[in-house]
């Protein structure tokens, strides 16, 4: 699913809610569900835009490193099989 809102927009929505706008009204006004709002609040609550961008960058880097680790572990297992198979 394609993201419709940027981190900057999401933080803006959260700030509107903090300023006193009812969640249902905020969701209706901007066209997203209250479930999305509460998910965003759990993830971005209290953050500034720069902090949200940093979080996103760290999540991307974490995913990349996990993939590299998994590939390295597979390579190690393959090498163990080759070494055990030699006379």
UniProtKB/Swiss-Prot annotation:
MF GO annotations = DNA binding; transposase activity
* Name of the molecule in the record: Insertion element IS407 uncharacterized 10.0 kDa protein
Signal sequence, start to end: none
| Xref: PANTHER family | LOW CALCIUM RESPONSE LOCUS PROTEIN S (PTHR33609), TRANSPOSASE (PTHR33609:SF1)
Its GO biological process terms?
DNA transposition
Q: Which organism is it from?
A: Burkholderia multivorans (strain ATCC 17616 / 249)
Q: Which SUPFAM superfamilies match?
A: Homeodomain-like
- Mind giving the lineage of the organism this protein is from? Bacteria, Pseudomonadati, Pseudomonadota, Betaproteobacteria, Burkholderiales
Q: Spell out the family assignment given in the record's similarity comment.
A: Belongs to the transposase 8 family.
């Amino acid at each position: 699913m394609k993201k419709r809102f940027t981190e900057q927009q999401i933080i803006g929505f959260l700030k509107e809610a903090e300023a006193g706008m009812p969640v249902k009204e905020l969701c209706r006004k901007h066209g997203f569900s209250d479930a999305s709002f509460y998910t965003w609040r759990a993830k971005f609550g209290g953050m500034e835009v720069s902090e949200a961008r940093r979080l996103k960058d760290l999540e991307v880097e974490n995913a990349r490193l996990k993939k590299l680790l998994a590939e390295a572990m597979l390579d190690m297992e393959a090498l163990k099989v080759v070494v055990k198979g030699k006379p």
